[in-house]
């Protein structure tokens, strides 16, 4: 009798312990389900976009809209982190980070691309672009010139997904640049590009290469007395504070390039690539639609400062400057040899194809 009682007690104890273990295991599973990320969240990818511009510029607007559209296309499975205002370094540093896989996208102008594929430098020749914004936009994104150059860029593990011209550039200066002769001896800040330097040597100026981040202080200290940039850049970077004149010239335009690495791009499947391209198209058109309002606002604020006089370049003087600037073509042709002549011919054909009839 005593033996049966002990057996029964032991059995009940074992059953109770087993039941406690089951309950504990169930509680642990519930706890872990809250502690660990969901399967969907664990698959979320983080992509970084970096650029050098400030709020109020077309580049900034494009990047923010691109973030919105990519995240929408991927239904929240991708998180886009945007690093504006040169937070991740210079254009060249960001481009290198893309090449080496530390950054998914960057939005530089064509200037840093020219350092590895010189043929892109044609975009920096003064007065070579159409005076019609959408002609340039279509020629860059649909024309044969950039397809041809893209094959060279891919050898450097880079791929341009979208070309987005900024608004046309103007000159800011401490002297009123109203005619060709005014450029003689002018200390103008330029991006450190062989072609851009050649542009101003053709005008008998004294081009002075200065990093973008140092332009304001260089103008303030008279290391340079002039520079070129779109109106919204002149405003957002406060260059007008240290310049007496802004001259509306429309002689060139910085061209933003949504750039990624071939390695990253090829890691995406076709459907994912199409999603990114759709997002880029929408973001570009959104940025373009807002450009006129931004330009007007920036111009009005510069005028309201009372510090800077806005001047227009007379059509006749623009023609004289354009003619004098053709001397810079020889530098491009010498630098790029046969490819240079081919690119210039292709670009002219693209402008004719997409130009206003």
Regions found by a protein language model. Give the residues of each.
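Short, low-complexity disordered leader/linker segments with a strong preference
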Residues: 1-46, 356-357
């Amino acid at each position: 009798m005593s033996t049966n009682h002990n057996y029964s007690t032991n059995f009940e104890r074992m059953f109770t312990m087993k039941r406690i273990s089951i309950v504990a295991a169930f509680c642990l599973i519930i706890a872990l389900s809250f502690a660990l990320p969901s399967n969907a969240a664990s698959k979320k990818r983080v992509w970084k976009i970096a650029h050098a511009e400030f709020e109020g510029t077309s580049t900034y607007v494009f990047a923010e809209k691109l973030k919105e559209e990519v995240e929408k296309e991927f239904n929240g499975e991708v998180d886009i982190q945007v690093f504006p205002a040169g937070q991740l370094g210079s254009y060249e540093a960001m481009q290198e980070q893309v090449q080496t896989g530390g950054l998914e996208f960057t939005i530089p102008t064509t200037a840093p691309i020219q350092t590895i594929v010189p043929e892109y430098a044609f975009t920096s020749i003064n007065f070579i672009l159409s005076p019609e914004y959408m002609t340039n936009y279509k020629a860059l994104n649909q024309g044969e010139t950039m397809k041809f150059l893209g094959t060279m860029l891919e050898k450097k593990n880079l791929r341009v997904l979208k070309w987005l011209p900024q608004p046309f550039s103007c000159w800011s200066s401490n002297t009123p640049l109203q005619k060709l002769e005014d450029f003689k001896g002018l200390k103008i800040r330029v991006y450190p590009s062989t072609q851009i330097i050649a542009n101003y040597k053709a005008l008998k100026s004294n081009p002075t290469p200065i990093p973008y981040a140092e332009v304001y202080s260089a103008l303030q200290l008279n290391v340079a007395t002039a520079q070129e940039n779109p109106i919204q850049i002149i405003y957002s970077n406060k260059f007008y504070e240290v310049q007496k004149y802004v001259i509306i010239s429309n002689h060139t335009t910085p061209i933003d390039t949504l750039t990624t690495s071939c390695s990253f791009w090829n890691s995406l499947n076709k459907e994912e690539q199409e999603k990114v391209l759709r997002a880029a198209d929408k973001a570009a058109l959104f940025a373009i639609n807002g450009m006129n309002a931004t330009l007007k606002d920036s111009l009005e604020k510069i005028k309201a400062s009372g510090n800077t006089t806005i001047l227009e370049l007379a059509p006749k003087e623009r023609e004289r400057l354009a003619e004098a600037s053709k001397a810079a073509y020889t530098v491009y042709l010498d630098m790029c040899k046969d490819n240079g002549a081919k690119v210039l011919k292709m670009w002219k054909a693209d402008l004719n194809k997409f130009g206003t009839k």
